[in-house]
Amino acid sequence: SYSVTGWRVGWAVAPSAITNAIRKVHDFLTVGAPAPLQEAGAVALSLPASYYRELADRYRTRRDHLIPALEKAGFRCYLPRGAYYVMTDISAFGFSNDVEFAAYLVKEIGIACVPGSSFYKHPKDGSQQVRFAFCKKPETLDEAARRLEKLRSRL
């Protein structure tokens, strides 16, 4: 991810029949990536292999810090193996859906999450899940853990 989460820059390598279809869709989505993103991409591709090992270690450390805090607060966590976020089950908190829970979390606890329903073809399938990102500074994760403790009163 090169620590530029959300930039949505990438490439595809595929047979021409597939890349032709990809290009047709891509033309409707964007004309081209902004020049600074292209420059950053070129630099990122030249990084040594150690960068990736260190990045994976940092994410693993952050993941292993956040998940126990989430579990202590009452979430059931789905262990990620290649992402910088964790999906969680919120059914223990008694909210009717993920959107309601996410709004409560921001307003009452001061933490943002992404409603799980936004990741499903059938939103109802994710209505008792939310996603938390752990690609944050350790101090931010510490503060999140502290704030999450307030949720225990909802159990």
Question: Predicted regions span which residues?
Answer:
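PLP-dependent class I/II
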Residues: S1-L155
